C-alpha cells in the first residue's frame, strides 16, 4: 500500500509514472525545499559575518560642548550674490531642522493614535445618560 492515495482508490495516474514514484521522484520533490533552506541559511550567515565583523556604524560629529556662537548662521543655504532676505522665525526653524545641532522636529502621533487620558483619575466615567452612579458601579466588572 506504499505510495498509494486514499482518495480515488489508489489507481495509477493517467499520465504514467508521477513525480512521487521511486527515489528520483522523491528527490525532485525535496530538492527545492533543500535549496531554499540552504539559501536562507547562507544569507543569515553572511549577514551575521557582515554585521559582526565588517560593518562599522558611523555617527555625525557631535556639536562642541562650548558656548553657542552669538551670530546665528543663515537659516538656509543662500545663493551666492543674492543678499539674504530675513525670513520669519517659523521658516528659518524649518530650514534648521535637518542641520546637526539644530532643533529636533517634534513628532506627534495622529489624533486616532493619541492617548486621551493619561491620568486614570481624569478619565470620564462610563455612565450612560439617565443612569445613576449606583447602577454604573453595579455594571462594572469586578
Swiss-Prot record:
The membrane spanning regions, by residue number, are: 36-56
Sorted UniProt keywords? Membrane, Transmembrane, Transmembrane helix
Membrane topology, from the record: Single-pass membrane protein
SS bond partners: none
Q: Where is the composition biased (Basic and acidic residues)?
A: 117-142
Name the InterPro entries on file. InaF-motif (IPR029162)
Q: Where is the composition biased (Gly residues)?
A: 1-19
Looking at the record, which segments are called Disordered?
1-22, 61-83, 99-142
Compositional bias ranges of the Low complexity kind = 99-111
Predominant location = membrane
Q: What is this protein called?
A: Putative transmembrane protein INAFM1
Amino acid at each position: 500500500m506504499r505510495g498509494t492515495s486514499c482518495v480515488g482508490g489508489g489507481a495509477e495516474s493517467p499520465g504514467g509514472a508521477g513525480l512521487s514514484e521511486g527515489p528520483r521522484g522523491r528527490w525532485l520533490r525535496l530538492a527545492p525545499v533543500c535549496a531554499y533552506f540552504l539559501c536562507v541559511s547562507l544569507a543569515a550567515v553572511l549577514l551575521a559575518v557582515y554585521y559582526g565583523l565588517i560593518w562599522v556604524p558611523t555617527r555625525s560629529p557631535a556639536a562642541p560642548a562650548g558656548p553657542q556662537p552669538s551670530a546665528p548662521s543663515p537659516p538656509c543655504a543662500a545663493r551666492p550674490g543674492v543678499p539674504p532676505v530675513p525670513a520669519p522665525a517659523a521658516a528659518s526653524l524649518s530650514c534648521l531642522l535637518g542641520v546637526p545641532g539644530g532643533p529636533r522636529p517634534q513628532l506627534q502621533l495622529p489624533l486616532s493614535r493619541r492617548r486621551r487620558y493619561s491620568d486614570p483619575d481624569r478619565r470620564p466615567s462610563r455612565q450612560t445618560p439617565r443612569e445613576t452612579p449606583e447602577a454604573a458601579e453595579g455594571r462594572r466588572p469586578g
